[in-house]
Amino acid sequence: MKKVTLTDVARMANVSSSAAGKVLNGGSDQIRVGAEARKRILDAARKLDYRTNMAASILAGGNSRLIGVFIDSFAAYRTRRLLQEIERLSQTLGYRIITSFTHDCIANMREDYLMLQRYGVSGFICCAHDYPHLRKEVRALFAEADNVVFMEKPCLPGRPYVRTSRLRALTEMIADAGRRGFRRFGTMHDWHAAPTEQTLHREFLQAILANGLEANEKLIFEYPKSIRDPGVRARLAMEKMILPQRPDFLYIDDALYAASVQSLLLKQRIPMMIHGGNDEPLFNGLGIGSLDPCYEKIAASLLDLLLHPEARNTVPIIEAVYKNAGG
């Protein structure tokens, strides 16, 4: 079967080969292609099943249209859901993503970073840099990088990043629960040394204070760093915080932990309101409400910072949204 060439696509779309190359391979910035011609070129490429020669495109000075994304392989639903939105929005912008999965290993991240650049990836989104004990290594890896944007504040000063906040949503959640008679608010979160967990801890206490209530550290349980199993962590939370302190309302960000705690509470016939935070579909099955982290807005902001460097003089802040759970 004869291989489809760029010339074949150009002929079907009734445009020049250079115009077709600009749309499909990146081409020179000196070449301008109108919206109607672009549509004809893309339609022709689909009909002919044209495959871009990536190596040739890069050598010719074109844009690979590839975005690299670093993800921690131990990441919970929140990060995986964000990756889905990054991929979906990238596709609408004419880009594809290549994902690097690793955990707690800067050496692997460095190898992937170098390899993906050899493949022509020109921009990266990093969602795997929140390692408190590896800050020196993270700084060394990205010290000279000007093609990386970060999800949450990195340990490198001045680098572009998108920040998220639950403060407003948590404040509204607690206010709504207070109107329904709840008074003792507890939460559970991961290892406190990680900046993202520090932020959750701080914002939860701030939301308590904003509602005129007393902040009580005894109602906050930190999962042991050495234990990863959600069921074991839930049992420890029951033993160390829930049973001794008896909160009447629990904010649990992740649905797996919420399900584990809910199961233990039901077995012991202890009534307690639980509210989630990462909007995982499992919450619906559990009958538990959840905050909306606004994943699409986060992904859009990350891509905007990456693809438009002129927008990097500000830090986008994406606020989670409280959806009244009722009852």
Predicted segment positions?
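Alpha-helical recognition/docking segments in bacterial nutrient-uptake
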Residues: 1, 5, 62-175, 179, ...
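N-terminal helix-turn-helix DNA-binding module of bacterial transcription factors
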Residues: 1-63
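Aromatic/hydrophobic pocket-lining residues that form π-stacking "cages" and hydrophobic walls in ligand
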Residues: 6, 41, 86, 173, ...
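Short beta-strand segments enriched in small/hydrophobic residues
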Residues: 17-22, 59-74, 184-191
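Hinge/beta->alpha junction and helix N-cap segments in small-molecule ligand-binding domains
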Residues: 71-80, 100-108, 130, 161-172, ...
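Glycosyltransferases and closely related glycan-assembly transferases
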Residues: 137-146, 205-209, 260-269
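Flexible loop/turn connectors
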Residues: 238-327
